[in-house]
Amino acid sequence: HSYPKLSLDYSNLLASCPGYSEEEALEHFQHGKLPQEHCGHLKGSWYDEKLMVSPLEERCEISFRYTAFGEILAGSSLECKEASLETIKRLGLNASSLQRARRTVLEEIISFVDELSDEELLNLAQDLDKPDDEGKYVRFYSAIVYVLKALIFPHK
């Protein structure tokens, strides 16, 4: 623990995905395998202030890019690239189960983008980039927003 005084400070706590779903764990255990860990389970106690990209940081948005296949990549900013790659690796953000889940959500969105104008796509991206009335975001919203903006502004 790098900052023991902050261990239970509410402003220092982040919710993390469980590492794998119950269904995924059961399926793996039935076949005598361990599920592929990701997120907090894989991260454990690792923390490096210079190499960890927190979702609370402003640089988080530029630190990652997404493909329509659900893969997460380091952002194009050279100053963030090393931290982005290390965060992806340490949290297992390209675990096959996460890629599949992101791809499923992205395929659903992509299935109707041809029906929308660029302005409507931009409005959708802006709406998804904000929490709802309960302070929650749509699952994989950052990937959805990235892909929508890439469709609107393909050369950025």
Model regions: which residues?
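Proteins with a high burden of low-complexity, intrinsically disordered sequence enriched in S/T/G/P/A and R
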Residues: 1-6, 35-40, 45, 78, ...
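Conserved aromatic-histidine-acidic binding/catalytic patches
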Residues: 5, 52, 132
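Short, Lys/Arg-enriched charge-dense amphipathic segments
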Residues: 10-19, 69, 142-149
